[in-house]
Amino acid sequence: MQIYPLRFVPNKIDFDFMNFKKVSYSFSIILSLISLIWISIYKFNFGIDFVGGIVIEVRLDQAPDLPKMRAVLSALEIGEVVLQNFGSERDLSIRFGSSSEENLMKNIDIIKTSLRNNFPYNFEYRKVDFVGPQVGRQLIEAGAMAMLFSFLAIMVYIGVRFEWYFGFGILIALVHDVILALGFMSMTKLDFNLSTIAAVLTIIGYSVNDSVVIYDRIRENLRKYHKKNITEIINLSINETLSRTILTVITTLLANLALILFGGKAIHSFSVLVFFGIIAGTYSSIFISAPILTMFANRKFNKKVITQGKG
């Protein structure tokens, strides 16, 4: 019995992606500008990792239902609330941001009242402390520099594996993806915390992987079809990898959707941001990082790429 691979597009599809190059560039520039303007006006909803907050240590008479307790406290609309065990199962740490001193005692009372009304436990409040942010200004700046150097390292890697202009294409796509992800985070008021930084790094990794698959096919087709121009080769390469691209994005989105629906509040911001970033990364790999190579169509492609390839 012959087994056929799963495909979402016909084998001989010949969609003219390059015909939409100017439209996709304009669309991406507009979205990026909107994101930057929105961020400059409305900023981010910084989580307690960045702004500090209050820690309440409490002991219960029995092990609590943590998922239900997280859901109840998250519904109080007092900002991000982090609930976790420390020591034994009956010892809890409740951490939340302090937006202003006036609301400090009020929010503590709201939490205590909510716990008392919704759970049949005996609560022994042991300590209430103010804690500073886990992520200081210097660490934020160091993280930004690390991301910048990661961009440069990726560009160098792609340049060594392919050619320098391939690295330039991926760099533009990554900057596009990060700007859109940050804009989306600002618009949707997702908590900006350590998990969302991890989400941005995940988006970068996914976008690079998606672009490299198309670049590999472009390099292969440059060696196979010497008489085709670069626009035809890019179109052909995108179409040949389209089934793989669609299959990958669907399976990844489905896995991420499970995290959004069942992962709970603790990873909600991470899951939602990665979901958006996967879509943005797929779009940029097809409509930005590959078409941008046509900027170099008037220069002679390095013969080593066409005849031998690198890596």
From Swiss-Prot:
InterPro entries the record matches: SecD/SecF_arch_bac (IPR022813), SecD/SecF_bac (IPR022645), SecD/SecF_CS (IPR022646), SecD_SecF_C (IPR048634), SecD_SecF_C_bact (IPR055344), SecF_bac (IPR005665)
Function: Part of the Sec protein translocase complex. Interacts with the SecYEG preprotein conducting channel. SecDF uses the proton motive force (PMF) to complete protein translocation after the ATP-dependent function of SecA.
Coiled-coil blocks: none
Gene Ontology molecular functions: protein-transporting ATPase activity
Entries under SUPFAM superfamilies matching the protein: Multidrug efflux transporter AcrB transmembrane domain (SSF82866)
Pfam families given in the database record: Sec_GG (PF07549), SecD_SecF_C (PF02355)
Transmembrane segments annotated in the record for this chain: 23-42, 140-160, 164-184, 194-214, 246-266, 272-292
Record-linked Gene3D superfamilies: Multidrug efflux transporter AcrB transmembrane domain
Entry keywords, A to Z: Cell inner membrane, Cell membrane, Membrane, Protein transport, Translocation, Transmembrane, Transmembrane helix, Transport
Entries under PANTHER family matching the protein: PROTEIN TRANSLOCASE SUBUNIT SECF (PTHR30081:SF8), PROTEIN-EXPORT MEMBRANE PROTEIN SEC (PTHR30081)
Record-given protein name: Protein translocase subunit SecF
One GO cellular component, as annotated: plasma membrane
Superkingdom, natural source: Bacteria
Membrane topology per record: Multi-pass membrane protein
Family: Belongs to the SecD/SecF family. SecF subfamily.
GO biological process, alphabetically ordered: intracellular protein transmembrane transport; protein targeting; protein transport by the Sec complex
Annotated compartments: Cell inner membrane
Quaternary assembly: Forms a complex with SecD. Part of the essential Sec protein translocation apparatus which comprises SecA, SecYEG and auxiliary proteins SecDF-YajC and YidC.
